[in-house]
A protein has these predicted regions:
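Bacterial N-terminal signal peptides
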Residues: 2-14
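Intrinsically disordered and other compositionally biased segments
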Residues: 11, 74, 169-171
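Active-site recognition of the HExxH zinc-binding catalytic motif
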Residues: 103-116
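Auxiliary, metal-adjacent structural segments of Zn-dependent hydrolase domains
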Residues: 16-88, 94-99, 144, 149-157
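Short amphipathic alpha-helices and their capping/turn segments at secondary-structure boundaries
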Residues: 93-94, 107
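Intrinsically disordered, low-complexity segments enriched in proline/serine/threonine
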Residues: 10, 19, 28, 174-177
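Long, well-structured alpha-helical subdomains associated
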Residues: 144-180
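Post-HEXXH active-site segment of zinc metalloproteases
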Residues: 99, 115-147
């Protein structure tokens, strides 16, 4: 006979449904070498996890994330969106190898979600919510803010971890010599 004993926390976790981006990427995101970084980011940032899950729920969308040596126009990342007559979307995200991917991934995923939401980038220019870069690509305030938000979430966790590590690894206080 085999008996199984679960801790209460583990039992609760087993009862909760596993959602996309918890332990694996949604089927419509192909990330190859970037998969571990994307999953780690989704596990530690609520905002990025929501982006990832939203992309995963968009059936007409396919996303490819790849590393590259250089990005056109001196950028660190870019997303090229392809729209198909039947309504499908394909997003090709390129990240410069060795860059800090935290802010870049969230920023580029937000560009994808802008297109899912039907944002017309040319219309956004007049309101200041979008602009053209030197290379002619569009940039948006929404994507910029998404990247900054995820960066803040990760930095806050890192700061907490650093404080805990300092306390855990701090040298014990020296005992004071007794006075006679």
């Amino acid at each position: 006979m085999v008996s199984l004993v679960l801790t209460p926390l583990l039992a609760v976790r087993l009862m909760l449904p596993v959602t996309a981006c918890d332990t694996s990427l949604p089927a419509n995101i192909a990330a190859a070498a970037m998969q571990p970084q994307i999953l780690a980011l989704a596990q530690h940032s609520v905002s990025f996890r929501q982006q990832c899950q939203r992309i995963g729920r968009t059936r007409v969308l396919r996303v490819t994330v790849q590393l590259t040596g250089t990005i056109e126009g001196r950028g660190r990342a870019q997303t090229v969106i392809h729209r198909y007559d039947a309504g499908g979307l394909r997003a090709e995200v390129s990240l410069q190898f060795g860059a800090d991917y935290v802010e870049l991934l969230a920023h580029e995923f937000e560009h994808i979600l802008e297109q899912v939401d039907g944002v017309v980038l040319r219309d956004e220019i007049g309101s200041g919510r979008a602009w053209r870069t030197e290379s002619g690509a569009f940039e948006t305030r929404r994507a910029f803010n998404a990247g900054v938000q995820v960066r803040r979430e990760i930095d806050a966790l890192t700061a907490e971890d650093d404080d805990a590590k300092r306390r855990a690894f701090a040298a014990p206080a020296q005992p004071r010599p007794r006075q006679p």
